């Protein structure tokens, strides 16, 4: 299954920011004596960093629960019989999603840097 992400930077490129947003950006940049571009860059970096921290915390929680470090390791434990799938499959799915989001946030942070 392919998930489509409509609000990716690629899909939003070329769209105009609402006037209120532009005015707010301009006002804050002026108050901080930085360019609007730098303010946007720092704001995006801070937001993405915050999101990444939350994702990593949830990954840490699930990983600690099963004594694993990744989805691959959890799947290996299923295969060797040291982890019951019936009790943990939802966490496996959640961890898989979180790892994808973590990797995507890292890519976005690199693009913003």
Q: Predicted segment positions?
A:
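Short, glycine/alanine-rich amphipathic alpha-helical segment
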Residues: 79-94
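Small, basic N-terminal interaction modules of short regulatory proteins
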Residues: 1-77, 100-113
């Amino acid at each position: 299954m392919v998930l489509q992400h409509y609000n990716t930077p690629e899909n939003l490129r070329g769209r105009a920011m609402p006037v209120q947003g532009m005015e707010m950006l301009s006002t804050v940049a002026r108050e901080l004596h930085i360019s609007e571009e730098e303010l946007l860059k720092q704001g995006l970096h801070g937001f993405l960093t915050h999101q990444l921290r939350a994702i990593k915390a949830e990954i840490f929680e699930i990983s600690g629960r099963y004594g694993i470090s990744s989805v691959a390791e959890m799947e290996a434990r299923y295969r060797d019989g040291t982890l019951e799938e019936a009790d943990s499959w939802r966490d496996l799915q959640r961890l898989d999603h979180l790892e994808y989001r973590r990797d995507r946030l890292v890519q976005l942070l690199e693009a913003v840097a």
